[in-house]
Amino acid sequence: MLKLTGHLFAWEPKAEYMDYYERALYNHILASQNHETGMVVYSLPLAYASFKEFSTPEHSFWCCVGTGFENHVKYAEGIYSESENDLYINLFVASRLNWRRKGMIIEQQTEFPESDKSSLILRCAKSQTLTLHIRYPQWATTGYTIKVNDKIQEIEKKPGSYISLNRLWKDGDKIEIEMPKSLHKEVLPGDEHKFAFLNGPIVLAGEMDLDERKIVFLEKKDSELRDWIQPSNRTKTSFITKTGFPKNVELVPLYKKSDGHYSVYFDCYEPSEWEQIRKQYEEEDKFLREQERRTLDYFRPNEQQPETDHRFRGENVERGIGASSRKWCQAYDGGNFSFEMKVDPHAPVDLVLTYWGDDGADYQFDILIDDQLISSEVLTGSCRGEYFDKEYAIPFNLTQGKSEVVVTLHAHRWKKAGRIFGGRIMLRK
């Protein structure tokens, strides 16, 4: 997406492209690397109580590790852009530009995003007239100022634009930019109760404990954000919430999270709404925590690394994406697919498969563990419009003394097997 954004900007230099570029750079590219080890993630999870799973130097080394390392040249790639007599300052990154076309050196000094300030110092053998376009970020809603040689410049444009400075530039000229970051929240499209916190362009992650209950925020939706959140004493880029239930959480930039669990999206309800749904919410939360506690292994179909990790195999296999962007796989015309799953050699376990409730009698198949039949399934389409889980008890003699088994779904003749959207091995209750 950054490559595409760069092409779009080259055709039409609009600030909104670089607003996007900046967000992707800090919240995805920078957030994808462990800043202690240099390892990178396969994917960047945003769900509740997620954690980043990094590659290792010798064992977890998938194709995304190569592109994951390539990504980090992007920090320098989009800082500046030029045309014949114009220079665009797109990003606030400490850097030194050798503008050969004009015989000019521009040094940018900043600690952004730790700081809200940046300065540009010009070095040139001869004075020359040209235009410097300095980005006025969409998130800088108050207090944005530019000084040239200590003189404040009049700004008539609004956030989400470029400030154009056309003048005779001399050796030693200095431009100072101040751009206070604004705290704001953004609603997840399609769910008015779910939102994320941002500080300027920086996505904030709530530090979580996996065993904690799910955090919600109780606040009127039109209330000021200062009623929700306040600066933390921990660092100048961290915050702490004020209206969390059952507790408040520390918020730090997502790119700084290399270990521990975190959440990017949180639920928000007005107090009156919360009282109506609280019991249901707590029951769902209890179920999910119990499910996580019992889970020994989890398989996600139609994803390259999970299929590789679980040694996925198949014949007459189809893959796709269903509701809520959940990925699936199925076998057709008597085909089959299999994947390896971890088990407990000392305790009984169950297989849990996730289906789509609309799938009906076309899906008739056998489920086998290490080639031993444990169930024959016929889907009925009785849970329309929703996903559902179904548990299959695995006889203990099929797992006793083993650390892994092969799960196989084999379609009956002219029928389909699946469609599964996930598979779990869980300790039996």
Which residues are covered by each model-predicted region?
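Well-ordered alpha-helical scaffold segments within catalytic/enzyme domains
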Residues: 1-13, 77, 123-126
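A short beta-strand element within beta-rich, extracytoplasmic domains
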Residues: 131-138, 343-359, 363
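Short, surface-exposed beta-strand/strand-loop-strand elements in extracellular ectodomains
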Residues: 142-150, 361-374
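Extracellular carbohydrate recognition and processing domains
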Residues: 374-399
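C-terminal beta-rich recognition modules with glycine/proline-rich loops and embedded aromatic residues
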Residues: 18-27, 32-123, 158, 167, ...
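Long hydrophobic segments that form regular secondary structure
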Residues: 112-141
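Short strand-edge motifs at loop-to-beta-strand transitions and within beta-strands
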Residues: 161-165, 337-339, 388-392
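Short, well-structured beta-strand segments within conserved domains
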Residues: 118-120, 130-134, 149, 170-179, ...
